[in-house]
Design a protein with these regions (language model features):
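Catalytic-core regions built around general acid/base machinery
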Residues: 100-112
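Conserved P-loop NTPase nucleotide-binding/switch module
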Residues: 62-92, 130
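A short acidic, glycine-rich active-site loop
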Residues: 84-100, 138-146
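Phosphate-binding/switch region of NTP-binding enzymes
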Residues: 115-170
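Hydrophobic/aromatic ligand-binding patch that stacks against planar heteroaromatic rings
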Residues: 7-9, 107, 148-149
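Conserved, well-folded catalytic cores of nucleic-acid-processing
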Residues: 47-51, 71, 107, 152, ...
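Conserved P-loop
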Residues: 1-71
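Loop/turn-to-beta-strand initiation segments
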Residues: 54-59, 111-117
Length: 170
């Protein structure tokens, strides 16, 4: 069942949707820009510096931050000529990926745009210090990128669909 995360984000005024995953084709009222490579995202960031872009857009939507981070990681690997970030010695791959992801995302609000980042969620089971298990809804975004996203976020919200007796969801 869909929750409408992208549809909700698309209601932000003058929004540009950077579609790292396809799922925005039926959403009206928002300008979608497909992103298939990190270099394409970096090109969009350059274009957003233009004053004309500020006339068109006030808010930038990243859909999803999970895939954006994966593409960032691939970009760092390609730059270094390796197939996985852990092939770079002394944790350089992880630190370069985190730095690139952080700097690119932070550049959006630094240019004066609002930033909306979308991730999926999952229900995970944890164990407390007394050995009791409990469930918590957490983003599917990995720990490294989540630290970056959390630090930048003013609001973190979770959405889930509610089904009415007549079968409608909202």
């Amino acid at each position: 069942m869909k929750t409408g995360k992208t549809s909700t984000a698309a209601k932000f005024p003058k929004a540009l949707l950077l579609g790292f995953e396809v799922g925005y084709l039926a959403i009206g009222g928002v300008k979608p820009q497909p992103i298939n490579k990190w270099s394409e995202f970096k090109q969009v960031l350059k274009q957003l510096k233009d004053p004309k872009a500020h006339e068109l857009y006030s808010n930038i939507i990243i859909d999803t931050a999970d895939i954006a981070y994966d593409l960032c990681e691939k970009y760092i690997c390609n730059q270094a000529g390796v197939s996985a970030v852990n092939e770079l010695p002394y944790g350089q791959g992880w630190s370069k990926t985190s730095k690139e992801f952080d700097e690119c995302l932070r550049s959006i609000p630094q240019m004066g745009y609002g930033l909306v980042m979308i991730s999926h969620s999952q229900d995970k089971t944890f164990t407390d210090e007394n050995g009791s298990e409990y469930n918590q809804i957490v983003p599917t975004l990995g720990n490294r990128p989540r630290l970056i996203v959390d630090r930048m976020s003013d609001v973190i919200g979770y959405a889930h669909p509610v089904e009415e007796e007549d079968g409608r969801t909202h």
